[in-house]
Amino acid sequence: MPELPEVETAKNGITPYLDGFYIEKIIVRQPKLRWEVSPELSQISHQKVTALSRRAKYLIIHTAQGYIIGHLGMSGAVRIVSPDSPVNKHDHLDIVMNNGKIMRYNDPRRFGAWFWTENLDEFPLFAKLGPEPLSGEFNSDYLFKKSRKKPTAVKSFIMNNAVVVGIGNIYANEVLFQCGLHPEKPAGKITKTQAALLTETIKKELTRAIAQGGTTLKDFLQPDGKPGYFVQELQIYGKKGCPCPKCGQKIESFTVGQRNSYVCLHCQKK
């Protein structure tokens, strides 16, 4: 699933082709995604794109009349193509611009979503989201206070969008390994020092991943068709049975919160 770095990469990649230009029309080929594509999108014509942003794992296209909100789901990707580019299987939505470019959305598993809203502050899926991990609001004091008396595994805790947004399974594994924290350690038992290290490492790892275009494991591609190169930097995710890069002990794998977790039992203590 595309996580925060992948959505940020997608936003950065399409911005030069959308921002400041006009949407001529939106072509919806498959309205039945995870949620039905908002019918208002098919009615959009000659609307100027005024900005692009991201909230959690949602891509937001600002227009003069409202907001187009996209979620890439499990396997979605956006790319910039020309009008003569052939439509492939799973190309479900096109945003046709007046500059001769098309933002095309492809989603083999159809778990993504595209919405329209006139008021971003009242968009229901944003109502319970926690702070952005790269913002000043997300700091060690916040994380430590939020974790108090929480019996939840620390991995599930940092993946909870009500605590902090955008941290998926890949980056949660990497962050906990860098911090030397066992994924099953109760969040309520992390110390102030560990909360500070966790906050710092989350920010560092996400920033590094964004700089390298995210992580491509299977489906994700940048808007220019290139993979995300952070996959080459992964230390522990997907490396069951491989030697730990810190101590050489074999990396173990088990499930935490219904997600695959990778851990070095020597380096990551409960």
Curated annotation (Swiss-Prot):
It catalyses: Hydrolysis of DNA containing ring-opened 7-methylguanine residues, releasing 2,6-diamino-4-hydroxy-5-(N-methyl)formamidopyrimidine; 2'-deoxyribonucleotide-(2'-deoxyribose 5'-phosphate)-2'-deoxyribonucleotide-DNA = a 3'-end 2'-deoxyribonucleotide-(2,3-dehydro-2,3-deoxyribose 5'-phosphate)-DNA + a 5'-end 5'-phospho-2'-deoxyribonucleoside-DNA + H(+). Involved in base excision repair of DNA damaged by oxidation or by mutagenic agents. Acts as a DNA glycosylase that recognizes and removes damaged bases. Has a preference for oxidized purines, such as 7,8-dihydro-8-oxoguanine (8-oxoG). Has AP (apurinic/apyrimidinic) lyase activity and introduces nicks in the DNA strand. Cleaves the DNA backbone by beta-delta elimination to generate a single-strand break at the site of the removed base with both 3'- and 5'-phosphates. This is Formamidopyrimidine-DNA glycosylase. DNA binds at H90, R109, K150. Binds 1 zinc ion per subunit. A zinc finger (FPG-type) spans 235-269. One of its GO terms (biological process) is base-excision repair. It comes from Actinobacillus succinogenes (strain ATCC 55618 / DSM 22257 / CCUG 43843 / 130Z). Monomer. The active site is at P2, E3, K57, R259. CDD domains: EcFpg-like_N (cd08966). Its EC number is 3.2.2.23, 4.2.99.18. Pfam families: Fapy_DNA_glyco, H2TH, zf-FPG_IleRS. Belongs to the FPG family. Disulfide bonds: none annotated. Keywords: DNA damage, DNA repair, DNA-binding, Glycosidase, Hydrolase, Lyase, Metal-binding, Multifunctional enzyme, Zinc, Zinc-finger.
